[in-house]
């Protein structure tokens, strides 16, 4: 599976063996009012457990986790 990953910039990379799901996790930090929600993209073996005030979306096809600003 290939997923978008966050870092210095958003890139699409092949996931490590055993990590066949892509995810997008969003949450608010102290800058949420001015910058919006923090967005983390990556690969995972299982969909992470949602903690309070987080939103997590998991999917299983190549590059199915684009940053919201990348969507057409």
Swiss-Prot record:
This is Long neurotoxin 4. Disulfide bonds join 3-22, 15-43, 28-32, 47-58, 59-64. The lineage of its organism: Eukaryota, Metazoa, Chordata, Craniata, Vertebrata. CDD domains: TFP_snake_toxin. Pfam families: Toxin_cobra-type. It is found in: Secreted. One of its GO terms (cellular component) is extracellular region. The keyword Secreted applies. One of its GO terms (molecular function) is toxin activity. Binds with high affinity to muscular (alpha-1/CHRNA1) and neuronal (alpha-7/CHRNA7) nicotinic acetylcholine receptor (nAChR) and inhibits acetylcholine from binding to the receptor, thereby impairing neuromuscular and neuronal transmission. Belongs to the three-finger toxin family. Long-chain subfamily. Type II alpha-neurotoxin sub-subfamily. Expressed by the venom gland.
């Amino acid at each position: 599976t290939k997923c978008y990953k966050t870092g210095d910039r958003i890139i699409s990379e092949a996931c490590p063996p055993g990590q066949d799901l892509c995810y997008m996790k969003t949450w608010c930090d102290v800058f949420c009012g001015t910058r919006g929600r923090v967005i983390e993209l990556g690969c995972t073996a299982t969909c992470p457990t949602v903690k309070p005030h987080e939103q997590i979306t998991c999917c299983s096809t190549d590059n199915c986790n684009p940053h919201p600003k990348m969507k057409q």
